[in-house]
Amino acid sequence: MRVLLKFLLDCDPDAAWRALQSPTAFREVALPWLDFQPDGDTSFPTVWGGGEHRVRVRALGAFTVGTQAIRLDTLRPAGEAEHATRILRDSGGGTGGVLSALPHLDHRMAIAPDPAGPDADGRLRTLYRDQLIVRAGALTPLAWYTLWAFWQWRGHRLRRLAPTWAYDPPAASVTEELDEPGRTEETA
């Protein structure tokens, strides 16, 4: 069974793409219903890399419901019309506890520029599409309803957090800083 989301995010596609690759944003969109912690003695990287990441999943901040493998890779559609689309795919699944009932998940998150173009203020927004395919045998209908409800929460949180993902330009160079009145190399 599938869970689908499709909406616009109030941030540019590059900011949305960075957020999808951030363990911090991953946790923020799930809170307070679920929280994720690294499984083992490691800490989350600043940015997800490809490969597998194991996590412990806590519900309502109170109890661990299981462990999950997050297996990430990035995809690009082959068609010219979708050239600007970037896709992050998680092909992991539950590995322990209640989550072991969901051993195979296929989760794809697609980021593309808003097809309508920039808004009246010249800001480009992001078309976000999310697809989760759930296979849990006889438990699939129950898993689908639970995940559908949680996905609605994720969608709400994504839309709410997106404006905070704005791109921060690189720090000014020392030369630019020295151009400020009253600044010298000694005070820089």
Predicted regions span which residues?
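Solvent-exposed residues in well-ordered beta-strands and their adjoining turns
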Residues: 8-12, 58-60, 112, 131-135
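Glycine-rich portal/gate segments that line the openings of hydrophobic small-molecule binding cavities
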Residues: 38-96
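A conserved amphipathic terminal alpha-helix motif
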Residues: 132-177, 182-185
